[in-house]
């Protein structure tokens, strides 16, 4: 990136110097063992740095230095007095290490204490920091240096020795100093990511340019979250994962730019109320939560994952999100079959349903009842169904092959082109669903039936062995026989049938 910027900056110079500079930097990068800048000459007191006829102002060299990766920038500062002064103003501080330890903390502390604090745009701890009483002092000190009116991105990942993230005791958590984001210091912040800490703003934070807020394993209340959102007018993405303490999430109407909302496993959460008018995608995975979506006319994409999600989607969504185009549903358990829908998903084009339990999906659930979902989606083009399980408990087609059911009223599907079923088994109701699709879809181009779990396969060349399918091997072979017996004869010549069978090399019974 620094090379490209340098080329642009030098475009006004003569062609000869441009070529020399480009070749110099390419050679320098190719020979790099310690730093891309080992060959750069030191500045000897002037405001011009030179190399082989390359004359650039000091501010351009400073800009080049700012575009280097943090490791290279630090090494350049070690061998060049000029770059050493630039190092104190390096804008992007990104720290990552596989095993953070005390030595890592000392290095970070040294780097930040030697930084001027001026011009920092990004501070990211991507690998996380183990938190204890002693590291609290360091974190406070580092944030005090880095969080200035110029900072645009802050990523603070904390690793806790306590694995019970839903404990009611928060004494051993790092308490993020919210005052650092007041008095204009957070005015340029665009992306804030906090994990495994407490975040308790008691005053309105000045985050008028914040576009993305991501909180994971953070202790914060609904009122405190509202305090953050009330001044985040530019917010576009809000992600709340495993945040304990929130009972109600209220999205105010002033968030005109909010287009993406994600809420997963916030266990105390009871209500999600949205008033943002332009919310386009919503992804959530919480059980027994009341959704007040308002007039979500702009919502095009929705995903949900919790027990009973299929039933809820059929009963509530068509009227609440009428313009939905992509719907993803995950449910480990359904108490009842899929009901007839009260109204239609007129614009739904892509439907993904995952009915995957811990061991086996409820044997009482009728896969054939999903027909009502398909019939309520006249614009549907793609349908993915995952029914992978450890043990098949449904009635097999070979145990009851008489009189396959058909719907009394035929709905012709003229837009559905691709259907894929992963974890395909010999369950009679699943065979009936597949036959219904073949009999009533005039536009179908591809039908994929995967009798494995749809995971790694040696046939792709990327893996040496296929992912084991364990006790489902016998059932997978039965599924192949069911396809050959009941489905292949129904496939029109215009439809491509792709069947993924157990691997003859990897999936062999011992």
Regions found by a protein language model. Name each.
Residues 93-96, 121-126, 152-157, 190-192, ...:
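Conserved hydrophobic beta-strand positions in leucine-rich repeat
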């Amino acid at each position: 990136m620094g090379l490209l910027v340098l080329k642009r900056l030098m475009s006004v110079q003569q062609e000869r110097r441009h070529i020399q500079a480009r070749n110099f930097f390419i050679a320098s990068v190719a020979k790099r063992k310690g730093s891309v800048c080992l060959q750069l000459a030191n500045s000897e007191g002037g405001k011009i740095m030179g190399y082989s006829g390359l004359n650039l102002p000091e501010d351009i060299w400073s800009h080049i230095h700012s575009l280097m990766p943090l490791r290279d920038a630090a090494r350049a500062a070690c061998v060049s007095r000029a770059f050493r002064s630039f190092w104190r103003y390096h804008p992007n501080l990104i720290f990552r290490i596989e095993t953070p330890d005390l030595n890592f903390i000392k290095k970070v502390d040294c780097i930040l204490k030697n930084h001027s604090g001026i011009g920092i745009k990004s501070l990211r701890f991507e690998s996380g920091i183990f938190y204890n009483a002693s590291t609290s002092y360091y974190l406070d000190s580092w944030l005090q240096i880095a969080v200035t009116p110029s900072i645009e991105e802050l990523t603070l990942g904390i690793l806790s020795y306590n694995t019970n993230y839903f404990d009611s005791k928060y004494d051993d958590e790092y308490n993020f100093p919210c005052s650092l984001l007041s008095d204009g210091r957070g005015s340029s912040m665009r992306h804030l990511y906090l994990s495994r800490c407490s975040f308790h703003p008691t005053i309105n934070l000045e985050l008028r340019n914040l576009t993305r807020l991501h909180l994971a394993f953070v202790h914060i209340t609904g009122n405190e979250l509202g305090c953050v959102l009330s001044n985040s007018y530019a917010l576009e993405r809000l992600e709340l994962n495993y945040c304990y303490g929130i009972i109600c999430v209220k999205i105010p109407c002033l968030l005109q730019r909010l287009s993406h909302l994600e809420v997963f496993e916030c266990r105390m959460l009871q209500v999600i109320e949205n008033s943002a008018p332009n919310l386009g995608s919503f992804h959530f995975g919480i059980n027994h939560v009341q959704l007040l979506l308002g007039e979500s006319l702009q919502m095009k994409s929705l995903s949900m994952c919790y027990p009973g999600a299929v039933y809820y989607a059929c009963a509530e969504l068509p009227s609440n999100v009428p313009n939905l185009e992509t719907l993803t549903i995950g449910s480990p358990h359904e108490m009842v079959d899929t009901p007839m829908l009260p109204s239609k998903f007129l614009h739904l084009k892509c439907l993904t349903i995952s009915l995957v339990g811990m061991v086996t999906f409820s044997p009482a659930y009728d896969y054939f009842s999903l027909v009502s979902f398909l019939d309520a989606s006249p614009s549907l083009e793609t349908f993915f169904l995952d029914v992978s399980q450890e043990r098949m408990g449904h009635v097999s087609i070979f145990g009851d092959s008489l009189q396959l059911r058909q719907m009394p009223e035929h709905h012709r599907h003229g837009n559905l082109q691709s259907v894929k079923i992963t974890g395909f088994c010999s369950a009679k109701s699943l065979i009936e669903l597949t036959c219904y699709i073949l009999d009533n879809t005039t536009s179908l181009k591809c039908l994929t039936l995967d009798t494995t779990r749809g995971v790694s396969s040696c046939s792709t060349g990327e893996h040496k062995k296929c992912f084991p399918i364990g006790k489902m091997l016998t059932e997978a072979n039965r599924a192949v026989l069911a396809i050959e017996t009941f489905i292949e004869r129904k496939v029109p010549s215009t439809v491509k049938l792709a069947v993924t069978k157990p691997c003859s090399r990897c999936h062999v019974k011992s």
